Amino acid sequence: FVDIAGLVKGASKGEGLGNKFLSHIREVDAIIHLVRCFDSEKITHVNSKINPADDLETIKTEIILSDLGIIQKKLEKGKKKLLSDKEIKILEEKLVFLNKGVEAKVNNEKEEEFLSSIGLLSIKPKIIVCNLDEENLSSGTNYTSQVEKKYPNEKIINICADIEDQLSGLD
């Protein structure tokens, strides 16, 4: 596991950690999105309000924008015959989905190998981890409900990172 600082809106254009963040997640095999799903006046949120569904949407958008940039550059090279016709076709298919705001999906192992080799992020397996406070861990919150509603096909796990942190300190 590699802990990489969060992504902010505009990262695909270099804002926040921007391209540094995106280059870090290119190296991982899967992406675990840890989103805050609890209220606390002691911990401020980067956007001043807690909305994990919006936080996830920001990440998804930035990943899609990054993938669009990668594919567009590769297609320009493809026109110079640096890619096979099959590779160009695959990229053009993925471009259609990405332009609609839909993450790229792979159809087979060879396609996955090719798309991974060029650094597409949207094809990586993902898990959403909702970080809750201890009292809502078993029941969830309105925030977890929003995440489940907006991402019904994603793997979602509820945890209390505070409890995990306390347990890790025990000898």
Where are these regions (language model features)?
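Short, compositionally biased low-complexity segments
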Residues: V35-I43, L65-K73, K150-K155, L170
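Extended, highly charged alpha-helical segments
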Residues: A53, T58-E93
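Switch II of P-loop NTPase G domains
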Residues: F1-H33, C37-K60, N108-I118
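ATP/adenylate-binding site constellation spanning eukaryotic-like Ser/Thr protein kinases
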Residues: F1-I4, L68, I123
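Active-site-proximal flexible loops/turns
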Residues: G10, I43, K74, S138, ...
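C-terminal-of-GTPase-core extension/linker across diverse P-loop GTPases
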Residues: K77-D171
